[in-house]
């Protein structure tokens, strides 16, 4: 599965709407970088966040998830408490081609501050805004900047399309917008 280069990403974004909105050059001055890079695309985090709280002494249960576990915040920055976690989503909406799998990695700027980003792979023919899991592994509050880079997506093209895509399975996170909480 080769990693796809900038010109392929640009062509897919412009001609097929793979990334919308698409930033054709990497923005770097005074911000955490975002936009097209040599072999990937650095996505931005939107300005609405769900921050974990334990006010009600809740238990996190992926099979019986309660939105009471979160405090909603909207703004140009998000402060994640020490050793805590937040959910956010990309500004960009992705439409993944049938023969492509997308892997996400965190930005080194955040990782060097103890802020870890996790996103599961974007499967063939999945589309939507990407829900991003952000962990603050430090004993200090951590600041996340909305509308700036949060993670990098790498596009891997398979040798052939899969027999069954995410769209074929009618996946539960298809066409999500905003932050999507766990679903069964």
Swiss-Prot record:
Pathway: Pyrimidine metabolism; dUMP biosynthesis; dUMP from dCTP (dUTP route): step 1/2. One of its GO terms (molecular function) is nucleotide binding. One of its GO terms (biological process) is dUMP biosynthetic process. InterPro entries: dCTP_deaminase (IPR011962), dUTPase-like_sf (IPR036157), dUTPase_trimeric (IPR033704). The keyword Nucleotide-binding applies. Keywords: Hydrolase, Nucleotide metabolism, Nucleotide-binding. It catalyses: dCTP + H2O + H(+) = dUTP + NH4(+). The keyword Nucleotide-binding applies. The active site is at residue 133. It comes from the Bacteria. DCTP binds at residues 107-112, 152, 166, 176. Its EC number is 3.5.4.13. Homotrimer. NCBIfam families: dCTP_deam. Belongs to the dCTP deaminase family. Catalyzes the deamination of dCTP to dUTP. This is dCTP deaminase. It comes from Acidiphilium cryptum (strain JF-5).
């Amino acid at each position: 599965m080769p990693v796809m280069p900038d010109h392929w990403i640009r062509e897919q974004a412009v001609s097929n709407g793979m990334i919308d909105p698409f930033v054709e050059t990497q923005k770097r001055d005074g911000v955490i970088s975002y936009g097209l890079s040599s072999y990937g695309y650095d996505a931005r985090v939107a300005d609405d966040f769900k921050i974990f709280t334990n006010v009600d002494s809740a238990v996190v249960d992926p099979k019986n998830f309660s939105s009471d576990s979160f405090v909603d915040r909207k703004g140009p920055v998000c402060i994640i408490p020490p050793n805590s976690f937040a959910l956010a989503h990309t500004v960009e909406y992705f439409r993944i081609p049938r023969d492509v799998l997308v892997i996400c990695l965190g930005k080194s700027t955040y990782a060097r501050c103890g802020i870890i980003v996790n996103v599961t792979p974007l499967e063939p023919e999945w589309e939507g805004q990407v829900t991003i899991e952000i962990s603050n592994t430090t004993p200090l509050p951590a600041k996340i900047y909305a509308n700036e880079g949060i993670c990098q997506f790498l596009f891997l093209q398979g040798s052939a399309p899969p027999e069954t895509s995410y769209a074929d399975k009618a996946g539960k996170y298809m066409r999500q917008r905003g932050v999507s909480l766990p679903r069964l």
